[in-house]
Amino acid sequence: MAVFLATGGGSDPSGPRALTSDEVNRLAMTRFRNYEAHGRAVTITVPGTAGGLIVTGSVDYRRKLGYGVVHGTGRDTSSDGLIEWTATSVAVHPMADAPAHPPASPPRSGWYGRPLQSSGSALDSSLAIALGLGSDRPDNAQLMPQNGAAWWGRDQVDGHRVDIMTGPSSRDRSGTANRVRYWVGSGGTMYRVRVSVGSVSRPVVIDFDTQKYVPVKPVSGVTPTR
């Protein structure tokens, strides 16, 4: 999965600058906050040359399992339906008239499984990124400035005052600092993430708490992390 810097949009023109100690600590905690919450409701906006996709659903950061409903934007409905994914697999349930939100209990049949693609698919890259936004422990705050983490501005997301910061996409991807933007609240809560993937020109946007979190139930063919 290739990850590159997404620039512009919503940041204060005075940025970038080095992070303060408080900002470093909040950025180090932000993925752990998702794990602490067990799961978060998400809306994943995936751009594409032939029209985009929007995934509305939930991610369980303890079990590394996501579940949602997919709708196409600016394209036909051939990709619409339910979706559930892990770090290595994807299961889809096509629906001609997909609901606005996924049902709390997934259908027992009608699912088709496949491996999650590590490259070449903007959707699969977006799903993998969303799963990677949780960690069972805080990131190393001392290493973040060394890896190029920076502050880019202030913004508001659904009434929450946030700082926009760049940093690594996950604990084991320190080289991606300055390539992923996080909208982080005063307590370290993550409200938005924006990142570009190599297969499309516009960034993927992941918004949190866009609807009520619904606990994720595994479907046949998708094995969550224990």
Question: Which stretches of residues belong to each language-model region?
Answer:
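Beta-turn initiation residues at beta-strand->coil junctions
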Residues: 44-47, 69-74, 92-96, 169, ...
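Solvent-exposed loop/turn segments connecting transmembrane beta-strands
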Residues: 47-53, 73-80, 173-174, 199-201
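Short, hydrophobic/aromatic-rich segments at coil-to-beta transitions
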Residues: 36-43, 62-69, 158-166, 188-193
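An acidic-aromatic
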Residues: 63-132
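N-terminal leader/targeting segments and the immediate start of mature chains
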Residues: 1-62, 215, 220-226
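Solvent-exposed helix/loop surface patches that form functional interfaces
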Residues: 104-157, 221-225
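Gly/Pro-enriched, hydrophobic low-complexity segments
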Residues: 158-225
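Short, exposed beta-strand/loop patches in secreted or surface proteins that constitute
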Residues: 56-62, 81-84, 148-155, 182
